[in-house]
Amino acid sequence: MVKHRNSSRSIISYSSSIARFFSRKAISLYLIFVFAFTIWVLVFSSRNIQTDDDHTKHQQQHHRDLIDSESFPPPYLPPRKNLQKPYENTQLWTPPFSFGLHPCVKPTPKYKEFSESDHYITVKSNGGLNQMRTGIADIVAVAHIMNATLVIPELDKRSFWQDSSVFSDIFDEEQFIKSLRRDVKVIKKLPKEVESLPRARKHFTSWSSVGYYEEMTHLWKEYKVIHVAKSDSRLANNDLPIDVQRLRCRVLYRGLCFSPAIESLGQKLVERLKSRAGRYIALHLRYEKDMLAFTGCTYGLTDAESEELRVMRESTSHWKIKSINSTEQREEGLCPLTPKEVGIFLKGLGYSQSTVIYIAAGEIYGGDDRLSELKSRFPNLVFKETLAGNEELKGFTGHATKTAALDYIISVESDVFVPSHSGNMARAVEGHRRFLGHRRTITPDRKGLVKLFVKMERGQLKEGPKLSNFVNQMHKDRQGAPRRRKGPTQGIKGRARFRTEEAFYENPYPECICSSKEHKEP
């Protein structure tokens, strides 16, 4: 019994010694393990932190390199500012209700198709891109009326834009010829046996009827070739046979497609804008030197700038009006809105500061300084140069007609189109957007807006809810909703009335836009 108790005590003592030994060793090992693990974590983390920091620095440097470089790898868009989206009326973006209207350009059963002819029309198109486009559409219809073969038009190379482009540089020549094969025979150049023959050189009367051109067919008795010196506004806006009007639409919207190079880049830029912004406004900011000089609008300019524009107007021979009262022009709504005025206008309509605005324009007179008041209200301004790289724009540099074509494509495809002045581009884009389904096009009431701007200058009104209410009431019926084309201003008689009519290409309804009761064309 005593032995057993002593034995048990020995075992317990031995076990306690072992436990104390292993306990001390375990603690030491544990401390060593913790210390080693801590060192490993610190080293690994510092490596990761350094790597991430290097990556961030690399990204920042890459971004700076992009901004500083001459050629942005497309698509390059500056970081969008003010991405937070405050409440914004969705009706600002949606197209007006179109009542089921749709394009209709097919000839009626009474239409007489092209028949072979040994008479030819050559034409020199005049003006900028859209003046030439609508003019060519008119001349195709004239050739059809006069039963003549049309030679591919020569483009204007001598006007303000000084663009050396030929027809095939701007338009898809083969598509033009092919699409009109039932309407007019189109050839690339005169046959050799005809080239040396004398030609009748004509300045066809503007806004003429079908009867006028039927009378002009007497020229075929003496000549095989008629050369038309100008192409724009050769046909009346109204009171023409429906088949003539639809032919004009077929030419403009189906025949005069842009060249593959222009169309491809234009659509790419539209895709880049939409993928970056989701939706955007195309602003035709007609605040270029030639427009201000032509209209005599000098509001907000320095004395030196005003004098520069006056000299330009005086020295441009085909601008007939030389002495212009700038204040009267502005009060009558005949001046393009300034960039600042456009900013006030768009803000008054309810567009948020985060709105992306594509500037469809040439060089803005006064540069970035003149754009600052617009940019302070809408920081997300986008230009061709920020959408495309230098390499993509290489073939467009020095060719104003080509760059105008890009602006046209981006404007037609925009969610909202806003022109600051009612020129050829604005009218053509509005008409095309109506044709495609009455896309939202907001036409500023410049005369009404100037009255509000004057009140603001006098301190009688400021930006805010009150101004916004005025602006919206003023423009509730100026957003591209379907309506028939407007006729001449009442009280104006003679040929002067034609200038007061709404242009056919600005609103081709009802001839080229039909109701849902009629069969939809493919």
UniProtKB/Swiss-Prot annotation:
Transmembrane region(s): 26-46
Enzyme Commission number, as recorded: 2.4.1.-
Keywords: Carbohydrate metabolism, Fucose metabolism, Glycoprotein, Glycosyltransferase, Membrane, Signal-anchor, Transferase, Transmembrane, Transmembrane helix
Listed Pfam families: O-FucT
CDD domains in the record: O-FucT_plant
Record's compositionally biased regions (Basic and acidic residues): 54-67
Subcellular location(s) per record: Membrane
Region (Disordered): 54-73, 475-496
Membrane topology: Single-pass type II membrane protein
GO biological process, one term: fucose metabolic process
Pathway per the UniProt entry: Glycan metabolism
InterPro entries, A to Z: FucosylTrfase_pln (IPR024709), GDP-Fuc_O-FucTrfase (IPR019378)
Residues binding substrate: H284, L285, R286
Glycosylation site list: N147, N325
Keyword Cell membrane recorded: no
GO molecular function: glycosyltransferase activity
Nucleus recorded as keyword: no
CC per GO annotation: cytoplasm; membrane; nucleus
Family according to the record: Belongs to the glycosyltransferase GT106 family.
Name of the protein this chain belongs to: O-fucosyltransferase 38
Gene: OFUT38
